[in-house]
Amino acid sequence: MNTLKVAGKFLDQPMLVAKFHNAVPTILTAGAAAYTTKEIAHAPQEKRKKAAIRIGTTMAFTVASALAAPKITNKLFKDADEIPKSIKELKKDATGLVEDFLKKNQVDEKSKQLLEKAKENILKYKEVKTLFKNFENNKNGKELLNKLIPDPENIDSKEIFSEIGRLSVFGLIPVLGGITGGIIGDKLTTDKWKKKIPDKIKEGSYQYLANIFLCNIGAGGALAIMEKLNIRSKGHRAIGMIGGIIATGVIGGSTIANLIGNKIINPLFEHGHKHKKEHLFDERKPEPLDIGLHTDDIATVAVMSGLKWIEPALPMMYSVSGYRAGIGYRNGKPHSDKN
């Protein structure tokens, strides 16, 4: 087994994925608190109280919605047997598999020690590599390892659009949460809060369309084509999905998002308002962080490729888009900074 496959197996250990999943709320909350503290400290002394309320409210709603997104999407899209198991359940399953295998098969002492460890603990990279190497010519051993650490499953044509929908709803929830928190934060700190709503919705649509939805469409569309052509290689499918993401999200995403903003969102908010010239017709241009946000598209490829380890990180990735929507970011300073 080559290095990449061993790395994939190591990262896809159910107990490792479950522990990472359980740690995400703490990691995301701590990161959000640190960023909020930094932003408040950088605000002018006389504006720090309002900045704390505005930024804190926006961040709180963003983080809360991002952490709620997995539960919501699981209820909407996943069957009961697909919902991740608890660590206790995983240990029970692993113990049963290992004990049943050892009763029926003779193995070397080193492999036995590692299997005993695998009942209730996460194996190290070298230990995973050792087990797969030792069981390379052992059919029953291979079957056991694939039960302990299941292989990624290619999504079939029937599941593609459901997965696009699930990931798109997953990404939408933090964006809506960020916008809601941003509006509440503005309402608590300024009488001009209504004037700031258009930029939040425009940035929300930009983040969602350019950095989330259209990228999912690109990846899913490419995957559907490869499924129709019966391309089963995970490497070729990954390359195809990345190509789809580049075409729809990275290249065309900002253009499409700005077009929708100018043709739909602007007319909706400009009617009867006095703030026609305040950024409403400015195009939102991609910045380095926007390009960086496309790292979550690698997560999209990984999830659609059946890898388990990346999914727990999605709330952290999508919360960046949610927060930017909440502050009504435009190129330059966020609109929320202006009073």
Regions found by a protein language model. Name each.
Residues M1-N339:
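Glycine-rich, hydrophobic membrane-spanning regions of integral membrane proteins that mediate transport
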